[in-house]
Design a protein with these regions (language model features):
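Metal-dependent phosphoester/phosphodiester hydrolase catalytic core
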Residues: 3, 8, 19, 24-372
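Sec-dependent signal peptide hydrophobic core
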Residues: 10-14
């Protein structure tokens, strides 16, 4: 079965099963936000979903993994409660039996008679000659173009997706890149700049409701890193350009954003929440490091306008003094040590996935007829 046929099958399965009426207590359970997998290792992979219901009580959710799409043989399974503490999201670090590692497997969730759609995933292969990665970033729901996710999900040649950050944006309607949101029926939810934990959860839920994004997540593992907009624009360790005094503590806002991020994303959580850098070894072909460049160690960005005097003169000496200050940091010593320790010469490719542009980026003008 190819990926296109599989996606048609799970689309039907979703319609038929995920809206089942269930339980003797008349509770309705649905999987409205899809399923996802991510952070594969040679032995394990993260599986994610979110359960919606007409009750605030906890829900016991089961996961099943099979080597066939009909699930006649279950090769791994388990259960976990979904509750209010994590916004009814469920995340499991599933161990794949040895004989199936590095191969495509199928997974699904069920709760009280309702089934999620079926997803495909895998653990990292130990031996591979070719491996294709789709890269995404800066995905703003009100602006549209999430059909790129759909295109990737239908491409049989793609093995893995990487999202480099700005998976979502914090703005309200009328602000950045919301010009076509009303016409496209993609206005931000909630219609405010997100600050509280509830705000961030609602925004994640809106993004995960997008059908094209759901297709991507169900079709392959996705490696995810955050940039600034998962918190707020131009964030650094201690503050952000788009954080005002009347929005409360930036430290609290950052914690709210990252808590919601870990709840809603198929990522393995590190012991220190902000230190979200990781390594993925894909056979002897690729050693991929996913870096964190925003909120663990980043110093405040140098602002050119801060070094222009009232009479319009550029204060060059002061600018370069700040720019070249040896105390300034982007990655921090701990992450730099991680990079040095894992800079390998036994891999064909050493890849660094991160959010900072290293060259000029020029974007073409998109004609109006494409938008329409």
């Amino acid at each position: 079965m190819n990926r296109r046929s599989f996606l048609k099958l799970i689309a039907f399965t979703t319609i038929f099963l995920s809206f089942s009426l269930v339980s003797k207590s008349n509770r309705i359970v649905r999987f409205e936000h899809g399923i996802a997998s991510g952070d594969p290792t040679p032995e394990k992979v993260i599986l994610w979903t979110r359960v919606s219901s007409n009750s605030d009580n906890s829900i016991l959710v089961f996961y099943e993994i099979s080597n066939t799409v009909d699930f006649k043989t279950i090769i791994a399974s388990g259960k976990k409660y979904a509750d209010r503490r994590k916004d009814f999201t469920v995340k499991v670090d599933a161990k794949i039996p040895k004989r199936y590692r590095g191969q495509k497997v199928f997974y699904r969730f069920r709760a009280e008679g309702a089934y999620s759609q079926i997803g495909t995933t895998f653990t990292l292969p130990k031996d591979v000659e070719n491996f294709k990665i789709a890269v995404f970033s800066c995905s703003n729901y009100p602006a549209g173009y999430f059909n790129a996710y759909d295109s990737a999900s239908n491409d049989e040649s793609i093995d893995l997706a990487v999202h480099l950050g700005d998976y979502l944006y914090e703005y309200k309607q009328g602000e950045y890149a919301t010009d076509n949101a009303i016409r496209l029926n993609r206005q931000p939810i909630p219609n405010k700049e997100i600050v509280s934990l509830s705000d961030y959860r609602q925004r994640h839920a809106q993004y995960k409701s997008d059908v094209d994004l759901q297709k991507l997540h169900s079709s392959m593992p996705v490696l995810c890193a955050w940039d600034d907009h998962e918190i707020t624009n131009d964030a650094w360790k201690d503050n952000a350009e788009n954080h005002q005094i009347n929005e409360g503590s930036f430290s609290l806002r950052k914690r709210n954003a990252i808590k919601a991020y870990y709840e809603w994303m198929p990522v393995r959580e590190p012991k220190t929440p902000f230190n979200n850098w990781k390594r993925y070894k894909i056979g002897k072909l690729i050693d991929l490091k996913l870096l964190e460049t925003r909120i663990s160690s980043r110093s405040k960005q140098v602002n050119l306008n801060d070094h222009v005097s009232d009479d319009g003169n550029f204060q060059k000496d002061a600018f370069f003094k700040e720019l070249n200050n040896v105390q300034r940091s982007l990655l921090g010593n701990q992450q730099l040590d991680f990079i040095k320790e894992n800079d390998r010469d036994d891999q064909t490719w050493n890849l660094y996935a991160q959010q900072v542009l290293l060259a000029t980026l020029k974007l073409p003008t998109i004609p109006d007829y494409i938008i329409d």
